[in-house]
């Protein structure tokens, strides 16, 4: 067989190996090939013979890699990348030469005589063979370096055998006679051979199968470079131990060192790290993220302290998410209560390649921190969508800081001084307060329930009672906020007060200097206001400034205009028990907003309107004038004669899709995106344009000053908004195109300079087409783009055309028809263009943030406009409620009075399908100021008293009320003591909690308060319970003179009404009818009637609760027995009174009035 025929046959049989080279392997000079009967090919190279396997056997080893390199051999594949030939492999500074045709045979792993000859052929070939066309390449990555020959495999003078150190593989004599070795030696060779194949046998392990692209090349992608870092981390570099054996190293990769350095500074944070085109979690963070996000976690090291227990692991555990899904997953982690940090790459591939650190890993830094209270990077935030689903938690997004000091007293006499600062980063609102609290911590609880924070920041140590309260409110997802609350703690030094005052002073002085408002009188007054805050509040404010600085949100404290004290007495006080018992913000069943008073009144169309209405509900007005103005506005907004103006307002609100309040504060923080900024400005322009034509308030068509003032504030911002919109390219902003975001006339010098540089490079690239055409001998050459690689020059695959291609041109890709090249000039121009693009991106970002800063100077005027719009939204919501049938406008009086005819429970009425039974109520400080309410269990007593309180609260919010008529006085507070529960954490029984809350009410209530007490005294014996209930009720009526609703099952208390001849205390009961044998069946009428219900009908409730009949029979018998005993005692007592009445001396003027009353009471009870 001729040499040419054998060569073509060899090519067909070695398809997998030929795919690794740009040129087909050619047999060296002097080589001959023969084909024996067994189908194996013997090829002689010099004096060595090569025994090769058929291609079918070779495909088993390398077929997978061949398919990866050449996905479609027969088709015209545009994505086939031609890899350069690799003939020499650098290892430890030396060069070894391998013939192309031999590595495939090594890879096959045959243990035959021909293989022995192969090894001698490799190691024993002449110098002239090794010098044949050497190709040197740079040392590869740690992944490929693992699989390279070491210099020990080359012949050296120190080698006693003179076989080039072939003991590492296996040494064979030049003539290939394997029979000269003994059986033991042959086994040793076989074992060494298998070890070699195991090391070099995988398709991915061939050193020349990995594409080697110079790091300085312009076309090198950023993601590829970053992913290479990840590969380096996943596959560590093995090194030799002392005994020559390979051991796994504990050496960290550069990226691992970066991660550990950042993690050590933020051990309480889940880090998500940008690596190329993915964000990755490492170590324990990966395990947590995989659990919360339901993503895959690749096993590995979990600890970051290089603990010996994980020495057997060579990499960190990891989990990854796509870049475009970052905020989706971050939001889920934040909602789960974690603190999440985003670590980003701070340099791009193009600038990195041109810089001095081109061979170093990407610079990474923690750029964002998020928690529940500080997550504002998503305009949707963590709130539910606008509507009335009522399924979300009632948290408001406040971050509350609390400090406690001066604990004095012990037990029930304990007093603590508390300071709080609560900030809502999404809106810029700041609430502060300073107060003293008792051992029940009712003041703290009230503020926490009102503010409903999503995150606590505790400064220093708390007392046990306060600590237990915080744990109770934040410990689980079933707490009163309906969600788990994050708690962070910071230390408090002994000199905290002085340090905090100094820190706050320097912070605001620095902010004023930066803004240039040092001499501004208004700014100085606001600064004075901040610096005169109480000591504990200042400590909290300082801690909050430091805490928010970690998240880049400290600017929120610049807005001192929006600092509001919590305990301003311009509002009705609703304490924690009242908020819970009356279901102001959430129901008591599943702790959602559905069924609450806020849910009932919420008909708002915007998010910022909904937030304002929530404040209105929790802070009813005390100022009668302000209240009447609000109610008049609500009345005017349902006037049929003004339907056109009202519909115009509703249409304007319905067009607003964005949460303007949140977006505005994001602009202030510099966190706003380009599309979001365009949306905000366009929405503000829409709002301003709606009433820009109006010249005076009279043109509005409304007479209410509340409405006209709010509408007049809308057009005031139009000029500023139009000025900013004129700077923006609308189409580019919609597409988030940073390069064309500004109109051409508004571009900065840096942007213009970068654009000119890019244009110049592109011009030179076009001119280079003519040069390339001249070299190729063509009239015209055009660039093409394939697989994202630009400026490729295509050359047809013919010997005539390919001969014209200079050696300096770099082949990038090709098909069967064409090859694609980059010229050195194109590479240089692309590098310049990428550098200009990076500079352009930086200039565009700088200009955009400068625009946001400019808009921030108008924050207060824009915020006032949004607040005016929110006010209109709330008024329209209340008008919607007022338009429902059965709602009337209440009349207000300066006297402490509640007079309601046919009032109804506002929430139960909406939730019940049946008609709600209305009831009357008449309370007045100078007349009847207390009602003693009795009646059967489940008769509607609690619903009745709640209805009275809710109507009073609704009236002072400014809403219409569900009644036929209502006259309401200005109540300063509503206090409730309802329900039975203990406090095991504080070691307090149900009765203890009941009396403690009652004691707080007796201390705080005033003659202008409404007090509701439900079954006081039931937690102890009957005698003690009656005594306590009677004493408390008497104190409420005689001393406090508060409006009181007292529910009880103690019929003996009804006699107290006779002690108040002017009717200050009156008995009422819930009506019912009896039927059936012995009156066992009763029908609840849910109507309030005069008098006392002398039975509670508890057995009826037991029957409704499906208590077993046998138990009911025993209970019924015992009840009858006890009633009979009591009846006999009363008859005996009445008989004695009657005897005394008969024996009374007629000359004395008849029986005493007290004696007559006792007779009447006895008869009434019987």
UniProtKB/Swiss-Prot annotation:
Signal peptide: none annotated. Component of the post-replicative DNA mismatch repair system (MMR). Heterodimerizes with MSH2 to form MutS beta, which binds to DNA mismatches thereby initiating DNA repair. MSH3 provides substrate-binding and substrate specificity to the complex. When bound, the MutS beta heterodimer bends the DNA helix and shields approximately 20 base pairs. Acts mainly to repair insertion-deletion loops (IDLs) from 2 to 13 nucleotides in size, but can also repair base-base and single insertion-deletion mismatches that occur during replication. GO terms for biological process: mismatch repair; mitotic recombination. The gene is MSH3. Residues 1-21, 117-126 have a biased composition (Polar residues). Pfam families: MutS_I, MutS_III, MutS_V. Residues 1-165 are annotated as: Disordered. Its main location: nucleus. ATP binds at residues 935-942. One of its GO terms (molecular function) is mismatched DNA binding. Belongs to the DNA mismatch repair MutS family. MSH3 subfamily. One of its GO terms (cellular component) is nucleus. InterPro entries: DNA_mismatch_repair_MutS-lik_N, DNA_mismatch_repair_MutS_C, DNA_mismatch_repair_MutS_core, DNA_mismatch_repair_MutS_N, DNA_mismatch_repair_MutS_sf, MutS, MutS_con_dom_sf, P-loop_NTPase. It is found in: Nucleus. This is DNA mismatch repair protein MSH3. Keywords: ATP-binding, DNA damage, DNA repair, DNA-binding, Nucleotide-binding, Nucleus. Residues 246-373 are annotated as: Mispair-binding domain. Heterodimer consisting of MSH2-MSH3 (MutS beta). Forms a ternary complex with MutL alpha (MLH1-PMS1). Residues 62-72, 107-116 have a biased composition (Basic and acidic residues).
């Amino acid at each position: 067989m001729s040499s040419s025929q054998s060569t073509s046959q060899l090519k067909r049989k070695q398809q997998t190996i030929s795919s690794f080279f740009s040129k087909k392997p050619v047999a060296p000079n002097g080589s001959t090939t023969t084909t024996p009967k067994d189908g194996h090919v013997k090829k002689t190279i010099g004096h060595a013979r090569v025994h090769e396997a058929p291609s079918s056997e070779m495909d088993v080893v390398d077929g997978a890699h061949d398919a990866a390199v050449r996905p479609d051999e027969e088709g015209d594949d545009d994505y086939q990348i031609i890899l350069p030939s690799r003939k020499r492999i650098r290892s430890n500074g030396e060069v070894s030469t391998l013939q192309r045709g031999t590595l495939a045979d090594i890879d096959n792993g045959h243990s035959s005589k021909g293989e022995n000859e192969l090894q001698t052929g490799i190691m024993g070939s002449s110098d002239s063979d090794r010098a044949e066309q050497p190709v040197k390449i740079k040392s590869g990555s740690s992944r490929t370096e693992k699989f390279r020959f070491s210099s020990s495999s080359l012949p050296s003078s120190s080698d006693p055998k003179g076989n080039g150190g072939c003991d590492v593989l296996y040494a064979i004599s030049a003539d290939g006679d394997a029979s000269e070795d003994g059986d033991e030696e042959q086994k040793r060779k076989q074992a060494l051979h298998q070890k070699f194949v195991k090391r070099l046998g995988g398709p991915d392990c061939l050193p020349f199968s990995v594409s080697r692209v110079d790091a300085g090349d312009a076309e090198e992608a950023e993601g590829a470079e970053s992913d290479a870092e990840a590969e380096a981390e996943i596959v560590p570099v093995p090194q030799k131990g002392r005994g020559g054996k390979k051991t796994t190293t504990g050496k960290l990769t550069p990226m691992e060192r970066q991660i550990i350095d950042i993690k050590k500074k933020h051990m309480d944070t889940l880090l998500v790290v940008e690596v190329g085109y993915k964000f990755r979690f490492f170590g324990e963070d990966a395990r947590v993220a995989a659990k919360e996000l339901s993503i895959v976690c690749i096993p590995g090291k979990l600890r970051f302290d290089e603990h010996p227990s994980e020495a057997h692991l060579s990499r960190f555990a990891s989990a990854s998410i796509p870049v475009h899904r970052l905020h989706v997953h971050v939001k889920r982690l934040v909602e789960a209560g974690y603190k999440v940090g985003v670590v980003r790459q701070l340099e791009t591939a193009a600038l990195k390649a041109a810089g001095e650190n081109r061979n170093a890993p990407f610079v990474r830094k923690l750029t964002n921190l998020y928690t529940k209270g500080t997550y504002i990077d998503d305009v949707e935030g963590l709130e539910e969508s606008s509507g009335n689903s009522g399924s979300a938690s009632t948290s408001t997004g406040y971050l509350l800081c609390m400090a406690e000091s001066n604990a004095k007293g012990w037990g029930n006499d304990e007093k603590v001084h508390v300071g709080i600062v609560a900030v809502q980063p999404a809106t810029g609102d700041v609430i502060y307060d300073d107060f003293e609290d008792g051992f029940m911590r009712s003041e703290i609880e009230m503020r926490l329930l009102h503010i409903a924070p999503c995150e606590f920041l505790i400064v220093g140590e708390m007392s046990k009672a306060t600590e237990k309260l915080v744990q109770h409110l934040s410990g689980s997802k079933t707490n009163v906020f309906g969600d788990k609350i994050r708690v962070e703690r910071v230390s408090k030094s002994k000199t905290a007060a002085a340090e905090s005052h100094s820190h706050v002073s320097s912070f605001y002085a620095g902010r004023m200097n930066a803004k240039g408002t040092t001499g501004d009188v208004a700014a100085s007054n606001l600064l004075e206001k901040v610096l005169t805050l109480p000591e504990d509040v200042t400590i909290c404010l300082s801690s909050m400034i430091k805490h928010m600085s970690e998240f880049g949100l400290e600017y929120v404290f610049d807005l001192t205009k929006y600092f509001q004290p919590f305990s301003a007495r311009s509002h009705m006080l609703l304490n924690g028990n009242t908020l819970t018992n009356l279901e102001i913000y959430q129901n008591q069943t599943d702790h959602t907003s559905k069924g609450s008073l806020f849910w009932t009144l919420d008909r708002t169309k915007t998010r910022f309107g909904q937030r304002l209405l929530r404040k209105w509900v929790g802070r009813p007005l005390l100022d009668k004038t302000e209240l009447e103005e609000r109610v008049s506005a609500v009345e005017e907004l349902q006037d049929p004669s003004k339907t056109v103006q009202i519909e115009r307002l509703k249409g304007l609100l319905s067009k607003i899709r964005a949460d303007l309040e949140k977006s505005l504060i994001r602009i202030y923080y510099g966190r706003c995106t380009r599309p979001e900024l365009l949306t905000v400005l366009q929405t503000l322009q829409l709002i301003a344009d709606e009433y820009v034509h109006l010249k005076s308030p009279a043109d509005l068509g409304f007479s209410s000053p509340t409405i006209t003032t709010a509408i007049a504030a809308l057009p005031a911002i139009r000029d500023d908004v139009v000025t900013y919109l004129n700077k923006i390219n609308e189409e580019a902003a919609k597409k988030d195109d940073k390069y064309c975001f500004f109109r051409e006339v508004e571009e900065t010098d840096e942007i213009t300079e970068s654009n000119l540089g890019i244009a110049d490079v592109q011009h030179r690239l076009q001119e280079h087409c003519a040069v390339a055409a001249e070299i190729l001998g063509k009239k015209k050459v055009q660039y093409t783009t394939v697989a994202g690689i630009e400026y490729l020059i295509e050359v047809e695959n013919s010997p005539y055309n390919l001969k014209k291609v200079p050696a300096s041109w770099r082949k990038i890709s090709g098909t069967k028809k064409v090859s694609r090249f980059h010229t050195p000039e194109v590479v240089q121009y692309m590098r310049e263009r990428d550098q200009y693009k990076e500079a352009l991106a930086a200039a565009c970002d700088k200009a955009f943030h400068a625009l946001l800063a400019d808009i921030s100077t108008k924050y207060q005027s824009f915020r006032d406009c949004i607040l005016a719009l929110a006010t209109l939204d709330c008024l329209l919501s209340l008008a919607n409620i007022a338009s429902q049938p059965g709602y009337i406008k209440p009349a207000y009086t300066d006297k402490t009075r509640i007079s309601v005819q046919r009032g109804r429970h506002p929430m139960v009425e909406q939730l019940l399908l049946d008609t709600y039974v209305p009831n009357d109520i008449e309370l007045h400080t100078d007349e009847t100021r207390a009602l003693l309410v009795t009646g059967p269990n489940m008769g509607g007593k609690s619903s009745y008293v709640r209805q009275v309180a809710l109507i009073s609260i609704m009236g002072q919010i400014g809403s219409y009320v569900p009644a036929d008529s209502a006259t309401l006085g200005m109540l300063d507070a509503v206090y409730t003591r309802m329900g039975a529960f203990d406090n095991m954490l504080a070691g307090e029984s149900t009765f203890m909690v009941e009396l403690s809350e009652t004691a707080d009410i007796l201390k705080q209530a005033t003659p202008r308060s409404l007090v509701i007490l439900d079954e006081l005294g039931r937690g102890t014996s009957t005698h003690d319970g009656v005594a306590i209930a009677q004493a408390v009720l008497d104190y409420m009526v005689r001393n406090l003179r508060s409006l009181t609703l007292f529910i009880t099952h103690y019929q003996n208390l009804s006699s107290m009404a006779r002690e108040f001849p002017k009717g200050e205390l009156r008995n009422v009961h819930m009506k019912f009818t009896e039927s059936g044998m012995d009156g066992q069946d009763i029908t609840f009428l849910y109507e309030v009637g005069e008098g006392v219900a002398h039975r509670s009908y508890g057995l009826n409730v037991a029957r409704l609760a499906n208590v077993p009949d046998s138990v009911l029979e025993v209970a019924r018998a015992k009840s009858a027995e006890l009633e009979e005993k009591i009846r006999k005692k009363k008859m005996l007592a009445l008989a004695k009174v009657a005897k005394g009445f008969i024996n009374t001396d007629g000359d004395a003027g008849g029986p005493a009035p007290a004696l007559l009353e006792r007779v009447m009471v006895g008869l009434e009870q019987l």
